[in-house]
Amino acid sequence: CKMPRQTGKSTTVVSYLLHYAIFNDNVNIAILANKASTARDLLGRLQLAYENLPKWMQQGVLVWNKGSLELENGSKILAASTSASAVRGGSYNVIFLDEFAFIPNHIADQFFASVYPTISSGQKTKVIIVSTPRGMNHFYRMWHDAERGKNEYLSLIHISEPTRLPG
């Protein structure tokens, strides 16, 4: 989604992930960021959102630590840094890549090579990528290919406040 900096993109996605985990049983979600500390921060935002839900909406929590969450309904959320091995071998319903433009090209290429079987095996697997632009890199190529219909990703541009037009 093409939006200005500091407009709550990552927090909005984390809120969506929490909703998805609570209202869907046995789903696996990965929150991946350019640094492990950033991914843990996003999981912390998810925890804050969870703690502020009405009690009737809160699922029982089986595991909650710095890097993961497991709910009573079988849903799991992993937080880690983006790497070639971050989600290898796993089956994920949603993969969230935060600040993806800050991942070095060789790691981004290795990541997508390793995660492609996971993404393509599930017909309903979602990949959400959010980033501040940073030069002509993997993120840039994916975005522009999506705009031209050269890949299966969607580039979303959202402008809710006309005075904050991007570009």
Report the location of each language-model feature.
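Phosphate/NTP-binding elements of NTP-utilizing enzymes
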Residues: 1-160, 164
